Amino acid sequence: MASVAWAVLKVLLLLPTQTWSPVGAGNPPDCDAPLASALPRSSFSSSSELSSSHGPGFSRLNRRDGAGGWTPLVSNKYQWLQIDLGERMEVTAVATQGGYGSSDWVTSYLLMFSDGGRNWKQYRREESIWGFPGNTNADSVVHYRLQPPFEARFLRFLPLAWNPRGRIGMRIEVYGCAYKSEVVYFDGQSALLYRLDKKPLKPIRDVISLKFKAMQSNGILLHREGQHGNHITLELIKGKLVFFLNSGNAKLPSTIAPVTLTLGSLLDDQHWHSVLIELLDTQVNFTVDKHTHHFQAKGDSSYLDLNFEISFGGIPTPGRSRAFRRKSFHGCLENLYYNGVDVTELAKKHKPQILMMGNVSFSCPQPQTVPVTFLSSRSYLALPGNSGEDKVSVTFQFRTWNRAGHLLFGELRRGSGSFVLFLKDGKLKLSLFQPGQSPRNVTAGAGLNDGQWHSVSFSAKWSHMNVVVDDDTAVQPLVAVLIDSGDTYYFGGCLDNSSGSGCKSPLGGFQGCLRLITIGDKAVDPILVQQGALGSFRDLQIDSCGITDRCLPSYCEHGGECSQSWDTFSCDCLGTGYTGETCHSSLYEQSCEAHKHRGNPSGLYYIDADGSGPLGPFLVYCNMTADAAWTVVQHGGPDAVTLRGAPSGHPRSAVSFAYAAGAGQLRSAVNLAERCEQRLALRCGTARRPDSRDGTPLSWWVGRTNETHTSWGGSLPDAQKCTCGLEGNCIDSQYYCNCDAGRNEWTSDTIVLSQKEHLPVTQIVMTDAGRPHSEAAYTLGPLLCRGDQSFWNSASFNTETSYLHFPAFHGELTADVCFFFKTTVSSGVFMENLGITDFIRIELRAPTEVTFSFDVGNGPCEVTVQSPTPFNDNQWHHVRAERNVKGASLQVDQLPQKMQPAPADGHVRLQLNSQLFIGGTATRQRGFLGCIRSLQLNGVALDLEERATVTPGVEPGCAGHCSTYGHLCRNGGRCREKRRGVTCDCAFSAYDGPFCSNEISAYFATGSSMTYHFQEHYTLSENSSSLVSSLHRDVTLTREMITLSFRTTRTPSLLLYVSSFYEEYLSVILANNGSLQIRYKLDRHQNPDAFTFDFKNMADGQLHQVKINREEAVVMVEVNQSTKKQVILSSGTEFNAVKSLILGKVLEAAGADPDTRRAATSGFTGCLSAVRFGRAAPLKAALRPSGPSRVTVRGHVAPMARCAAGAASGSPARELAPRLAGGAGRSGPADEGEPLVNADRRDSAVIGGVIAVVIFILLCITAIAIRIYQQRKLRKENESKVSKKEEC
């Protein structure tokens, strides 16, 4: 088989490289539709036009409107015609035509393409051929198929040659089709971890295909490793792609030597590059773009024997592979496939196989640059000088990667000499040549070839020559000499020697970018240069490198590092806890309350209490309860402090308590909370009270403001009472603290410090008035804060003219606004703040549009988010708007963020001076009707409720949160409204916890069982007739929903058994081969319906989920949330007189089939969780009893945290709670079952219970016999009279 695959591969490799694309090889057969003909005129643009009838909008192929094509004002090779396809398309061919009925046509041209209209890339034919053949007349069409095709949104046609007897004239068409693009963006600190489906045999073939666009020159693209050091890694290193392959331990005879394959160059150019990796046994094929490296490994294919996970974008676990602990990838991956699986699609759908780490998004940002580029060493720009002046003065900025190159040459008048400015070894050097004298040289700067912009100022006058590079100034004194400025300055290179200019560039011309050129006091206008109105040039491309130094001053916040790119500055937010263009937005929620309402369970979390404010995030423990979210901040003090007697007046103890968070962070968190407390547990033996008898404080504590407090507990300041004194239950009513009594015994006080304006405690000082034998000990607990008073702070706006007003918003350089809203109206203004000319406004402009508009002096700017569904659905929607010096962004809910870049060199400060209006405007028009909640400006929360209480037309608070947050209540839990938030009612769920998501699991030892009784228990004092009557209370079902999860290695096993008083039953078992079997017997006169589901061997020690849904005769079975199967019952549709549900071993399965009896005898050994039959949850009823017990337990059943985290099934499990059978302290299985609430009886009580149960069973047998007889008779008379009830 491998030889056949290799033969096929060899055939493919013999094909021309132009006909095979590594990613998505081969074009669709119909990918040749015209793309430009249907575009509007606005989609066409050009460098210039001869007249309005020669505009780019008339450049469609075979069209005759206008003048019959596009013709620029001037015919030269710097003209261009551009098309915007509207979105990225796959382009497979182009066609050109001359101007209709004219002598204007192009004979050759260049084709460039771009994703975003900037950062153009030139299409190359056959690697080295750049130009395309054009037309020979005005009417014929020249069609060219692109091999290989490419994907782009923008295309540019650059004429190189044209009819010498005419002008440039073009009509064009572009062919292709829609392009499927699944994009994932990594910001340099993120990764995707893809867990593969485990297979019993290692694969003989692995195929990985992707495209990538690199924003940086280094980074891990993918990594996969095994148990013995074997790994494969694809890494971008200095713009080259390196594939590392290591089979592991070199001492093993079968391993191969490490392999390193390198392909590609300049792959960090922010353009797409394709990669294909094929591991075919020992054959390795590594393809980048059109270049393929074949490698035949010696030895076996042990490098394929890797773990069942692969990471993209980085190595997610630091230190996991020390040899490859490298920088993560910064850029985009497109159409990422592993063995045919679309990994990006799985990540978008949040499939369980994918783990996203860090800031991973699914859109690829496009660079925007307007550069001025010197294309070759022959490039030059000649500009007129200030002829006749007695000085030379030139300033400019440059950017380059070259260590050497000519920058500037000028010749002085009257033969007085010349000067040349050039780069050598990354340093700037200036040489002045004068007749009869040695050259005068000046050197300034270092490392100027770092790709950054550097400013240069050169001046020469009578007695000195001065060069300033950035902040490095170099001065060269001159002998008094006449400096007479020349006529022309040459930047970047020189004219041909035949021109007689005298310009020389022995180190070669400059390759890079120039900007901000001034000669004398006059700035050079680049637009005039482009239009040919100023100077002359060669091989100069304008609009290719026009950036300024935007990192001085740095607008990066929160310690973010500023770095340059082609068109703007960027902030490296790695390790800051913030994100965004300026590291302004926090990565973390502001409180545990916010974490809770994102569905997060209890655990350690970072919180950022002031949001985008100056305070950083810090780590806390969030304790999520059903009623609230508690923030727990631990201190670093001792667990317990012990005190012993000392002479009078001497300090007994002064202990300081430090916290992981700073004072400002703690203050912000405490102020945000609804209430906070800290508990002090005090134990004392013959110790003194906290104060002397004359009232002098002997003990005190210090809060966060460094103030001393003598109040203990929740009392008023200086009340000097412990908690027992406040509650009036001290052991001695004469005192206000238990320790005041001074008894010769150990007593205790629990002190709750709850004045949150003073918390947390930073120091406790305790002294004593002189009891040598006294002793005490105290423990200070963590800081506990409940809730978030800003998260639910809200106001309801009832009239269009109503609003709340606050002081003006001060956000000059950075302004962010975030809030929740809900409404039923179609429009309204959320907030508005005005200045003299500046303003900021956020509004609901239409039912599906939210708009953020502002003006900082550059003219009004708008950012709009459109939704496919209306926002006026009376549910909470979250809005976040940000405006900074780089632009503006707006995001609503989880919709894609919309951004608007700021204009270059425009105004950056937002100056506002009016009041801030919330819910309306200053003109009282277009007011908002609805609710606004949790409004924050630059991280500062506004108290809406306080203002609403005194504002007509506005009410504090909002109702109706379950419509938005009800989805947090999982697994059948019901959302219940609270005044401030919601809570989940788990009464009818098999789970518990704040979101009904905590698994209730139990380990069943061999021979154990748990029985849930659907009928109520009746005492033996009732007469037999009443007992029989009670058994007539049927539970008859025509439908039921059953869910359970399990893990075991034993077969056969009984997972669940539901019995009936009529010998009807349902059994769910694992057969001897581990297959799932379900049997329904709904008519005791017929054989049961038996169904086998050969999904897999489910007795494999792994966790499996089973869901059974019956609707009369239709049964739907779902396994592991994926595999589904539907079956039809033939034995009936009614489950009559349901008696009990049994988990584990069944002592007697009367009337059951042989397979069910065998499984019932074997029982179940392993872990069961989330068991639910209709509304009955037997595990929950046993482990979380909330009323009279319906559960009986036999044998050893131990609760477990989670089945997935438990011990291997089939092995003894460590019991996590007292055993649920036989009574505490006894060993061995119980002989008979008993209600769970009586599990702790003494032995005599147990014996009595056993006797009672035996008697009860005998009575049940008699009653059942009577019941069967009566039921037969009843069915014969009228079967329709059988009572029915709803699902239990």
Curated annotation (Swiss-Prot):
The segment(s) forming the Laminin G-like domain are: 183-364, 370-545, 793-958, 1015-1203
> Pfam families, from UniProt?
EGF, F5_F8_type_C, Laminin_G_2
Sites carrying sugar chains: N285, N359, N441, N497, N623, N706, N1023, N1073, N1120
Residues on the Extracellular side?
Answer: 26-1245
GO CC, any one term: extracellular region
Cystine residue pairs: C31-C177, C332-C364, C513-C545, C551-C562, C556-C571, C573-C583, C931-C958, C962-C975, C969-C984, C986-C996, C1167-C1203
For this entry, list what GO says about its biological process.
Answer: cell adhesion; cell recognition
Please list the residue ranges annotated as the F5/8 type C domain. 31-177
Per the record, what ranges lie on the membrane's Cytoplasmic side? 1267-1288
Transmembrane ranges, per UniProt, are 1246-1266
The chain positions of domain Fibrinogen C-terminal read 584-792
Matching entries from PANTHER family are given as: CONTACTIN-ASSOCIATED PROTEIN-LIKE 3-RELATED, PIKACHURIN-LIKE PROTEIN
Protein name listed in UniProt: Contactin-associated protein-like 3
Species of origin: Homo sapiens (Human)
Q: Which gene encodes it?
A: CNTNAP3
